[in-house]
Curated annotation (Swiss-Prot):
An aminoacyl-tRNA editing enzyme that deacylates mischarged D-aminoacyl-tRNAs. Also deacylates mischarged glycyl-tRNA(Ala), protecting cells against glycine mischarging by AlaRS. Acts via tRNA-based rather than protein-based catalysis; rejects L-amino acids rather than detecting D-amino acids in the active site. By recycling D-aminoacyl-tRNA to D-amino acids and free tRNA molecules, this enzyme counteracts the toxicity associated with the formation of D-aminoacyl-tRNA entities in vivo and helps enforce protein L-homochirality. One of its GO terms (biological process) is D-amino acid catabolic process. It comes from Geotalea uraniireducens (strain Rf4) (Geobacter uraniireducens). Its EC number is 3.1.1.96. This is D-aminoacyl-tRNA deacylase.
Length: 155
């Protein structure tokens, strides 16, 4: 699994001009599921994201987690994170999980994040979505589960 996470002061996602998910202070997660991913990777990623200390404390130091600030999370599925652009001019999506597997792990990740105490809003899986955000910082990180690092997958 791969995720791009952004610290936001607000973020939202629309489908067909209608807002389907929106958060205020928190994290926007763009989540890509790859072949071979399992609930183990989803657990690792959810734990990492909710506990990652990327919010500033009173001294201005990144020392607080999403749990600490009682923030929200907007999860948006994005299969293009599994894209490989190393050859040619058209990305290959050979490593992306099939939709029927990806949706299960995406929904599992969302549920796990809820279990960890974070309110979650979502986009709609496989929909054409318009995502808007105000990146706070800007602060953006790319996370890969340990399994992806071991496989040596790179975009």
């Amino acid at each position: 699994m791969k995720a791009v996470i952004q610290r936001v002061s607000e973020a939202g996602v629309k489908v067909d001009g209608r807002t389907v998910g929106a958060v205020e202070r928190g994290i926007l997660v763009l989540l890509g599921v790859e072949k071979g991913d399992s609930t183990k990777e989803a657990d690792w990623l959810a734990e990492k994201i909710v506990n990652l200390r990327i919010f500033e404390d009173a001294a201005g130091k990144m020392n607080l987690s999403l749990l600490d600030i009682k923030g929200e999370l907007l999860a948006v599925s994005q299969f293009t994170l599994a894209g490989n652009c190393s050859k040619g001019r058209r990305p290959s999506f050979d490593t992306a999980a099939p939709p029927e597997e990806a949706i299960q792990l995406y929904e599992y990740f969302v549920g796990k994040t809820w279990e960890l105490g974070i309110p979650v809003q979502t986009g709609i899986f496989q929909a054409d979505m318009k995502v808007s955000l105000v990146n706070d910082g800007p602060v953006t990180f790319i996370l890969e589960t340990p399994k992806n690092k071991e496989r040596g997958t790179r975009s």
